[in-house]
A protein has these predicted regions:
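Conserved donor nucleotide-binding strand/loop of the catalytic core
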Residues: 77-88
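Conserved beta-loop-beta/alpha segment of the NTase-like Rossmann-fold superfamily
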Residues: 87-159
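Short aromatic/basic micro-patch
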Residues: 36, 117, 150-151, 182, ...
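Acidic helix N-cap motif at the loop->helix transition within catalytic regions
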Residues: 67-73
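N-terminal glycine-rich phosphate-binding loop and ensuing alpha1 helix
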Residues: 11-63, 67
Length: 212
């Protein structure tokens, strides 16, 4: 499988991105998507990651502190939807986002808004695998550990919306293990989220990932 560093083609089976930004940020004590980083906010870095590879259909799912995030998204020209049930957890935001994907979407990424260190090259590898193999789920892994974002075929949308069991998206995708492809990536950023003030201080300055 060969992938290059050029922007991925989106003309056949368009690919979308869901950014999950509805959570409480309870351990951070601040609104995580609005934390300053690299001269921007964290949410702007995450949005820019998808723009970098040519994904035009990016949808941000909001909930807690939506009023603070909306001006940033409007400035970026990015679409958003508000999950009124965000207190029910991240999977409720996944479902809200999936409900609002544009018709004709071939596959979609799901990335929490507190993970700004994923590399564009990783996304390109996942898209390349999707184009070449036609499976249902593509999961990046680094040194044997699965990370974010998965790339999920739109064929699983009905199953996602119908799922009522425990464990959320991870449990649902595990039920389709035989249709999953794990893609090796030289990218520790797929494992790094900004969950606590200590995480933010640790990665704010010393961690300088290649975005490509």
């Amino acid at each position: 499988m060969v992938c290059n560093s050029q922007p991925v083609r989106m003309d056949d089976q368009p690919i979308a991105a869901l950014i999950l930004a509805a959570g409480f940020s309870s351990r951070m004590k601040m609104v995580k998507p609005l934390l300053p980083m690299e001269g921007q906010t964290v949410i702007e870095l995450v949005i820019g990651l998808f723009q970098m590879i040519g994904i035009a259909d990016t949808l941000v799912v909001l909930g807690y502190a939506a009023d603070q995030l909306i001006p940033v998204l409007n400035k970026q020209g990015v679409s958003y939807v508000i999950n009124e049930d965000y207190r029910r957890g991240m999977f409720s935001s996944v479902c809200k986002g999936v409900e609002h994907l544009k018709e004709g979407c071939g596959a979609f990424f799901v990335l929490p808004a507190d993970m700004p260190f994923v590399r564009a090259e990783t996304l390109q590898k996942l898209v390349c695998a999707f184009r070449e193999t036609g499976k249902a789920v593509y999961r990046p892994h680094y040194q044997g550990r699965l990370g974010h974002p998965p790339l999920i075929s739109a064929t699983l949308i009905p199953a996602i919306l119908a799922f009522k069991g425990p464990g959320g998206l991870r449990a649902l995708l595990a039920a389709y293990e035989e249709r999953c492809v794990d893609v090796a990536c030289d990218d520790p950023g797929i494992l790094i989220d900004l969950d606590t003030p200590e995480d933010y201080q640790k990665y704010r300055f010393p961690y300088k990932p290649s975005r490509y």
